[in-house]
């Protein structure tokens, strides 16, 4: 009854109006699952391959018909007859079918769409929520959200090198309250920007993208918004950055002029670490992502030695949700946290392996969206299923972001008294 009878993919659009895949999995019992695949703007060079058509006459070359065809003509044929509940076997079968180290033949987008749809079909067959199916009976931790309320770098036209400026309502008693705090700060920020005559249009991830005078102007404006909303920076609400520094790193230089023009500095790795430390000393920063370039291993190790006890240092482009890179980071003492993006690696099985490896090493795992998202809310379920404790899924606007928050509200409601919001305790990698 739980045997797969059909797998079908179609091309749909993501939140940027670019094509992506939607995959449906059908079973003998009528149980059904659907998965949609996100896409990034700033991508790590070691990520699994997102297969695009390259036909410039169609969607500017970004079409996904090749990946769709790979699902409908190759993957479907291989998976029909599998038990939908055997996630690991199905994921491993697709990896073997692809046969490349980076899923470059079939496309990580094709494989991931199927992987998500299979999990959803299994949960539907068992008539249990997705988070319960993926996580089992000990599923209870609601994630502390990192809310990207100012967009810079490759996610906006704002003249700021850092890609994301986030608020982290770690002092809230519940997820529901954390979300309320975030929304109130978001609206306070909008009002402040209007009063300053700055733009209130939002970027790819729902945050504002005004023309600030620089990084510190952005940070101080966020702190003002936190206080205006009635919360205490550094006690109730903390700050986070995604530097996305690989976007402005070139030949050993962190070149801020790429995004900031003449005002921008050019820093060596040592100067970059000094600058990050200055910001940490000055502001209530609890988490920083990709502060160093994805290939600057010496820089990462030096940064971690300097700040690893005080602030969460998250590897995104640095680790690309890949256990090979994470294992090296753990061994060499580089970073203390991994960002988890399902499409960086391409299957749920490999995603869960990365989260497990991080936890065993005392690293945190932050489940994350991509800048090109859909209404699919699977990452909300993954964050709870794994008790990851942290999620990064954008600002308090745009339905593609809110879909994940609303799903977490549902899950918290369903869990009832069992639900646990750990707040600051989710940052168990910090010693000070």
UniProtKB/Swiss-Prot annotation:
SUPFAM superfamilies: Enolase C-terminal domain-like, Enolase N-terminal domain-like. InterPro entries: Enolase, Enolase-like_C_sf, Enolase-like_N, Enolase_C, Enolase_CS, Enolase_N. Binds a second Mg(2+) ion via substrate during catalysis. Its cofactor is Mg(2+). Keywords: Cytoplasm, Glycolysis, Lyase, Magnesium, Metal-binding, Phosphoprotein, Secreted, Virulence. The active site is at 205 (proton donor), 341 (proton acceptor). Its main location: cytoplasm. Mg(2+) binds at residues 242, 289, 316. PROSITE patterns: ENOLASE (PS00164). Pathway: Carbohydrate degradation; glycolysis; pyruvate from D-glyceraldehyde 3-phosphate: step 4/5. Probably phosphorylated. Gene3D superfamilies: Enolase-like C-terminal domain, Enolase-like, N-terminal domain. GO terms for cellular component: cell surface; cytoplasm; extracellular region; peptidoglycan-based cell wall; phosphopyruvate hydratase complex. GO terms for biological process: glycolytic process. (2R)-2-phosphoglycerate binds at residues 163, 341, 370-371, 392. It is found in: Cytoplasm; Secreted; Cell surface. Belongs to the enolase family. This is Enolase. It comes from Streptococcus mutans serotype c (strain ATCC 700610 / UA159). The gene is eno.
């Amino acid at each position: 009854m739980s045997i797969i009878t059909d797998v079908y993919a179609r091309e749909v659009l993501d939140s940027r109006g670019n094509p992506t895949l939607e995959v449906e999995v059908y079973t003998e019992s009528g149980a059904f699952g659907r998965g949609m695949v996100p896409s990034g703007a700033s991508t790590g060079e070691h990520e699994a391959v997102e297969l695009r058509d390259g036909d410039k006459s169609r969607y500017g070359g970004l079409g996904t018909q090749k990946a769709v065809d790979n699902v409908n003509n190759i993957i479907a044929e291989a998976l029909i007859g599998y038990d939908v509940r055997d996630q690991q076997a199905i994921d491993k079968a697709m990896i073997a079918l692809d046969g490349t180290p980076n899923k470059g033949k079939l496309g990580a987008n094709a494989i991931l769409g199927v992987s998500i749809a299979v999990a959803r079909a299994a949960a539907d067959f068992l008539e249990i929520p997705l988070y319960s199916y993926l996580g089992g009976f000990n599923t209870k931790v609601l994630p502390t959200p990192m809310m990207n309320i100012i967009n810079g770098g490759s996610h906006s036209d704002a003249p700021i090198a850092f890609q994301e400026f986030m608020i982290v309502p770690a002092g809230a008693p519940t997820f529901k309250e954390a979300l309320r705090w975030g929304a109130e700060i978001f609206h306070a920020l909008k009002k402040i920007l209007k009063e300053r005559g700055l733009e209130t249009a939002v970027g790819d991830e729902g945050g504002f993208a005004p023309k600030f005078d620089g990084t510190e102007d952005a940070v101080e404006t966020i702190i003002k918004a936190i206080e205006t909303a009635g919360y205490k920076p550094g006690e109730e609400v903390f700050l986070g950055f995604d530097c996305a520094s690989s976007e402005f790193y070139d030949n050993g230089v962190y070149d801020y002029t790429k995004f900031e023009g003449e005002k921008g500095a050019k820093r060596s790795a040592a100067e970059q670490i000094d600058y990050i430390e200055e910001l940490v000393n000055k502001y209530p920063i609890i988490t920083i992502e990709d502060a160093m370039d994805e290939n600057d291993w010496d820089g990462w190790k030096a940064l971690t030695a300097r700040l690893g006890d005080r602030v969460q240092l998250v590897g995104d482009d640095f680790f690309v949700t890949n256990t090979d890179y994470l294992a090296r980071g753990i061994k060499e003492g580089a970073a203390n946290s991994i960002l988890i993006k399902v499409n960086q690696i391409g299957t749920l099985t490999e995603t869960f392996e990365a989260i497990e490896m991080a936890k065993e090493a005392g690293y945190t795992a932050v489940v994350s969206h991509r800048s090109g998202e859909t209404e699919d809310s699977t990452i909300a379920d993954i964050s709870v299923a794994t008790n990851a404790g942290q999620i990064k899924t954008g600002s308090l606007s745009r339905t593609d972001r809110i879909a994940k928050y609303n799903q977490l509200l549902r899950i918290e409601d369903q869990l009832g008294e069992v639900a646990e919001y750990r707040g600051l305790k989710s940052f168990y990698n910090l010693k000070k």
